[in-house]
């Protein structure tokens, strides 16, 4: 009814492809760097195409210093009542699923993730709210560094992978 859809042009085009209703009268198209001032909050829109989907943008609220990061910085797993990353032992309980999430959801778009990380470096971020997984309010640089490592395809540990097939076990013994 009285709703305004705030989205970038690519998102509007996609909505029109999937839904049959007049959206033009209810839309505010935003682009890179645009600011939506609601009084207390000022939302800045930052394009992050292919950080999972082609139309992705993240939103930064300068009042709360919160980055609404869409699929970036997300993870698989159930929250179970603890919505903040500092309320769980993230490194031991969540990091494997965060790595798997990165690999499966945005892993092939390392260049685009790097572009987003460069944009984010110039923003005073106090909290990261991804679409999936816990909210980050402490130790943000640790998790941002993980994304840097993963998006540059830098090995986290030194290792060697030995791939073999062994019908009778001799090759397995040699490996």
Regions found by a protein language model. Give the residues of each.
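Divalent-metal (often Zn2+) His-rich catalytic cores of metallo-beta-lactamase-fold enzymes
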Residues: 62, 66-67, 73-96, 104-156
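Redox- and metal-dependent alpha/beta enzyme cores, enriched for Fe-S-associated oxidoreductases
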Residues: 166-175
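Flexible loop/turn segments at secondary-structure boundaries
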Residues: 14, 136-138, 169-170
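Short alpha-helix adjacent to the SAM-binding motif of class I
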Residues: 14-18, 173-174
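Active-site metal-binding motif and surrounding structural segment of the metallo-beta-lactamase
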Residues: 1-5
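Short gly/pro/ser/thr-enriched loop/turn and capping motifs at secondary-structure boundaries
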Residues: 11-15, 75-76
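Catalytic core of the metallo-beta-lactamase
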Residues: 20-87
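Cofactor-binding loop segments of dinucleotide-utilizing enzymes, especially the Rossmann-like FAD-
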Residues: 8-10, 71, 163-167
């Amino acid at each position: 009814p009285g709703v305004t859809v705030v989205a970038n042009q690519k998102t509007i085009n996609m909505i029109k492809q999937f839904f049959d209703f007049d959206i033009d009268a209810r839309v505010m198209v935003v682009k890179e760097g645009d600011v939506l001032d609601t009084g207390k909050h000022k939302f800045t829109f930052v394009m992050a195409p292919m950080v999972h989907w082609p139309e992705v943008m993240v939103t930064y609220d300068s009042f709360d210093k919160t980055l609404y990061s869409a699929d970036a910085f997300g993870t698989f797993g159930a929250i179970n009542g603890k919505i903040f990353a500092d309320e769980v032992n993230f490194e031991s309980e969540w990091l494997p699923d965060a790595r798997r999430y990165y690999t499966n959801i945005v892993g092939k778009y390392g260049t685009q993730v790097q572009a987003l990380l460069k944009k984010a470096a110039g923003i005073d971020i106090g909290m990261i709210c991804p679409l999936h997984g816990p909210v980050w309010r402490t130790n943000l640089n640790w998790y941002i560094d993980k994304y840097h490592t993963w998006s540059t395809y830098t090995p986290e540990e030194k290792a060697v992978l030995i791939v073999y097939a062994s019908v009778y076990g001799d090759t397995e013994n040699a490996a």
